[in-house]
Structure formats: structure tokens, C-alpha cells
Design a protein with these regions (language model features):
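Short terminal alpha-helical segments
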Residues: 1-33
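Generic L/I/V-rich hydrophobic alpha-helical segments across diverse proteins
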Residues: 7, 11, 31-34, 51, ...
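Short alpha-helix boundary/capping elements
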Residues: 11, 39-43, 55-62
Length: 99
């Protein structure tokens, strides 16, 4: 199965659902960035690796900020939450398509 084609279609559908939302809304921005990434990559393994990294983005960011910066207002970032959620949904979508 070609993950690039499957995910590209999935993301385009998701973006069409968000067509009337501001371009900088966290979910739309994360989907747009993922679509850009898919345009640059060809390997299924690289796509899965990127999604796994993205799925932990919010947790890793909080851990890093906690260690080096005491400003708790930076811990909850809507964009990184959206990135993590979309990556998890995409991985789940790919898993369901495989079966």
C-alpha cells in the first residue's frame, strides 16, 4: 500500500472540511504542514517515522520546556496538541486501511 497516496487523500478530505476556517487554526495548519511533508517524501518507512515523532510532539515539548524554562504558560500550545492528535489519527487511519 502506498501510504503517501492514502494519507494525501485523507488529509485533503480533512482540509476540505476545514475550508471555512482561518488558515492559522491549529488543526488546519498542522494538516497543511503534513500535506507539504507528504509531497516531499516517498518512503512508507519515513512517513511512519515522521508520524510517530509527531504523535509525541506535545509531550516532548512540555518535557523540554519544563527542564529549561519555568514559564508554564508555554506548556499548553494548541498547535502541538493538534500535531499530536493528527499524527495519532493518521497512524490509526493507516492501520485500519492495512486491515
Amino acid at each position: 500500500m502506498n501510504y503517501k497516496k492514502v494519507l494525501t487523500r485523507y488529509i485533503q478530505v480533512r482540509l476540505s472540511e476545514l475550508s471555512n476556517v482561518d488558515d492559522y487554526e491549529p488543526n488546519k495548519l498542522a494538516l497543511t504542514n503534513l500535506l507539504w511533508f507528504l509531497g516531499k517524501v516517498t518512503s512508507n518507512e519515513v512517513i511512519v517515522a515522521k508520524l510517530k515523532i509527531m504523535s509525541n510532539a506535545d509531550r516532548k515539548r512540555k518535557k523540554y520546556l519544563y527542564r529549561y524554562d519555568g514559564n508554564e504558560s508555554l506548556y499548553d500550545d494548541e498547535y502541538y496538541k493538534a500535531v499530536s492528535a493528527i499524527a495519532k489519527e493518521s497512524l490509526k487511519y493507516l492501520q485500519n486501511k492495512k486491515e
